[in-house]
């Protein structure tokens, strides 16, 4: 019953589809046309205007659970890689991706083992990654070990990014918010 209520809540609060182009007013004297990152992109793209207005602030303000991060550090290794499918327009992506990268930095997990893929407001891109990776909501963090998917975090964390990743890596039975649907 709790899962059904959670799913209904998530459904009504999930990423809305805003206009694909809007204005970012973080710069004082001029407006910047906002264009979403679509397809493959690099982490450094998030630190450039106009994305830096939310990425840097959310990265800096994220309070890392160091105790859990230390446990993850013992489990994460070169056999692990991660795909992050997100939308720069999506509030859940804006909230969760910077904290994810703060954790990856703490773990000294190489950016080369994290692949970033952007989707548009319809949760699509020209490469059809939404179909290839069976994306239902974003952000989606897909964890691979030796190239095989082991689990994924979909849209929202169940406990926290650290605790959810720990459960994925230690095999203690992590189920994302959409598991079984």
Enumerate the language-model features and the residues they cover:
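C-terminal motif of bacterial Sec signal peptides marking the signal peptidase cleavage site
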Residues: 13-14
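Thioredoxin-like thiol-disulfide oxidoreductase module
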Residues: 117-137, 168-169
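Non-catalytic, surface beta->alpha helical segment in thiol-disulfide oxidoreductase systems
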Residues: 143-179
